[in-house]
Every structure is written in C-alpha cells, then in structure tokens.
Amino acid sequence: MPLQQPLPATTALGRTPVLRAPQLLGDWVLWLEQRPHEKGRTTALIRRWWETDSTPLELTPAPINLRSRVHDYGGAPLTATLTEGTLQLVWVDDNDCCLWFQAWTGLNGANAQSLQAIASPQRLTSPSDSALGGGVIDHARSRWLGVIEEAGCDRLVSVALDQGHQTPVVMHQPADFAGYLALSSDGAQLAWVEWQQPSMPWDCSQLVLARLTTSGALEDCHVIAGGEPSQPQGISVFQPQWLPDGSLVVAEDSSGWWNLMRHPSAENLSSHWQRLWPMAKETAMPQWVFGMSTTAWDGDKLLAAVCDQGEWQLQRLGLDGSAERVDQPFNDLADLNASNGRAVAITSNSTTGQGLLELNLGLGTWQHTPAAAAAMEVNEISVGQPLWFDGSGGQRTHAWYYPPIGGADASSPLLVKSHSGPSSMARRGLSLAIQFWTSRGWGVVDVNYGGSTGFGRTYRERLQGGWGVVDVNDCAAAAKTLIAAKHADPNRIAIEGGSAGGFTTLACL
C-alpha cells in the first residue's frame, strides 16, 4: 500500500541544495553549494573543520555565480589555496565568464566570521566569448594555470594574480582537448590529460608531463601513460595526482578496470609504472566535467573511493601495496579530498540524503552534515535492492530495484529509470525523486544498462555500435525480470529518463 501521506512533489524535487567539491585548507573546510531557491546559483562556503554547529561564511555572495562552461559541462569553477595564513580564491563568474581573484586573512580566528577580505574581488581577465576553468594556482609564480576553450579549441593558459583585465597567456596547444591539471608541490612539473576526437576521455586519453622553466614556460612535453588514438584498444587515464615524495599517481584502465598506478619518479621517465593495487573494481568515473576526485593523499596513505558492484566504499592504500577499508556508513561517494589524517567528501546512502562527510582517519570517527533536513522517516524509505538479470545478448546486467512501500505483487505498477550519460551510473544514494513513486505504491527499477560505468571497461563498451539497442533491451529485460517474479503488472509499466536516458526512454516506446 502507498503511504497515507505520499511524498509531495514540491519536497521531492527542486528544494535541496547540491553540495560539491569540498576541500580541506588547514583547519578549515570549504565547499560549493548550488541553491535552487536562487535559480541555481553556486557559491563557496567555509567553516572550521568539524564545527558543524558554527555558521559558515559565504565567500562569494550574490550576484557572484561560480560556473565554468568549458566543454559546456564545465566543472572546477573555483580554485582555493591557503598559504602562510592567507586564503586565496580564483573563480569563474558565470555572469561575465571572467576569471576573478580575492584573498582573506584572519584564519587564526575562532570561526569563519573572523575572516577579513584583503580587498574587493578583482577581475583578472576581460570579458570574451571564451570559457575558462579547471585551474590550479602556481604560488611560485603568482598565477593561475588552467584551460581556455575558444573557437572550439582547448589551450593551457596562465593568468597573473596581480593584474586586471588580462588576455590569458597560451602555454600549450593540445591536438584537441585537455584538462585535469596537476602541479607538483615544488612548481617544477605540470601533468595533465589530453584526448582527441572522436574519443571521449573515458574511451582513450593520455597523461602528459612537462617541466616548467624559471619563467614559467612549459618544455619537454611527454606522453607518459594512456592510450594513443591510433591504438585499436583505447586506454583511459583519470585524475593525475602528485604525492609528497615526488611520485605521480593516476587511474587507468588497461587492465579492464580503472585501477591506480604510481610512477616512482616523474623526473626519471625510464623508470616503470607500478600497479600497486590491482582489483576488479573501479577507482574513477567518466570525466564529464573538470574537478572530479576519487583519490587524495591523507598524509600517510592514499585514500581512494572504490566502486564495487555499483556501490562505493573508501579504502586506504599504502605505497607498499597494502589496502584496508575505511569503516563508514556511506555507499555513494564523490569529490574526495584529504590532508593530514582528515578527509572530506560528498556522500549519501540508502536512507540519508546528500551531505558533507568529515572523517578523522586517525580516530576512526566521522560526521555527516546533510544538505537539507530529512524529508522522510527511515521506515518510510524504500531501500534499493541489487538486481542482476540477463540483459541484451544474454549479458549479466545490473539495476537497483526499489519495491513500493507496503510491498510488491503482480498488480504493482513499475517505473523503469534510464540514467543519463549514457556513461553515468544508477547510484544507491537516497533519491527523493524515486521515493516520490515508491510512496505512492509504485516499484522503481533504476537500470545500469550496458554502457554504464562502475562495472569495468567491457561493461562500459557494450553500448559501442549499439546505442538505442543495448540500452533499450536492458531496460526491457529489467522490467520483464520483475514481471516474471510477480513484482510488477505487465500492463502498468512506465519509463522515464533525461538527456541520454531520454533517448533511451523514447527508443523504448
């Protein structure tokens, strides 16, 4: 039976802020918040680590709107660093697509209200039709390094932090696309990812390394990992990251799974990559946007978000090849960041909505600050159950099945969901949009059709040459599986999806 008071549509959709990109800065935690009540404006907030009762300070008040439009999808509109007691922010404002800079002092104070802006925000670049994003701050040369997209071309550029209305200085011209910059701690080396048409970065990409001269120019660019466009079997790389010992870590999928590899010395290219943590699990996601993060150095080990059978977990990985799972209750993880035995991420689980997770790795403690107050009691929530079935071509396929509140039988209506992407994945974190239906007596099956990520490269490549066929067959097979199990009425089946999932939805009709 449906609930006596089903979840209202106004509660299920469009009211909860979306949190992104948390970052540890000394004893402070900064994050981005996209606000539905402000027409989707994104702003940056900061408060002291672990002090959930304190009021965060909004660093970028209205009308500032943090958004990058590189490759349309954008990502990483803000770069933040803390050096010698000064907080520095560089951001892209969607109002003019310009790069802006501001700095604060007062971080020794008791709370965020003690922060004092050194000066008003300074516009670093002039308005233009170009898009900027995905940057890092080069402290040694007091500049921002990032990507500019203009006239359909990507370039790596630099922008000085002490000048206004500049034209970005071009440092490197890739063949097609570039992103995911990583600057070594000494400022002497820069790594980034490139990919070429017609590949997406999760199909085939390369990790490029270059030296920075004293003047800040790039020299001696080398491809050091990934797949060449001419190779029949693509290799994808994800999130290059420097470790304190000067080694470089990246996720790549030549094994069939996005696993982590470490290069012991980026200065000695004759040394070999070390695959220290082989596993039939994923440690990366499809790179739709800049700024994605699934790994972070916690001061002692590499902390990694790992996807296993559609669920995410945290592991601590030692440079000796050891691995241990971090005990915490959340199985949907994104935007991982860590420092000095602490970690933050955006997380949820089947009964807890999206929020900011803070972890004290030394003590093994955690706390979670939801983006919004709980909209449902735990006993009112339908928890997703793993469903494996024979999909297109008889291949084993995954979905999350949410039974209607009160239980399912052969007369229950069923909603099939086809996610976007198509390289995205159906996650298990609490979705009020799904609970809207289950609270009304509907079952919901959220299908990880062929082409979804989180299940290895072979699963992801099922859709190649078969988009509109494999995904359609998988969604239909999920519904038929539940009908055969007498969990759904064959005459009461609906399907929904947006973007790529909208195409699948229409193709199913």
Protein language model regions, located:
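Non-catalytic accessory segments flanking enzyme active sites
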Residues: V18-A21, L32-E33, T42, G133, ...
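Short glycine-enriched nucleophile-adjacent loop
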Residues: G502-L509
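Cap/lid segment of the alpha/beta-hydrolase catalytic domain
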Residues: A372, M376-N491, G498
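A short helix->beta-strand "capping" segment at the edge of beta-propeller domains
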Residues: M1-L19, E58-P63
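Conserved beta-propeller blade repeats
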Residues: G14-W28, N65-L89, S128-W144, Q173-L190, ...
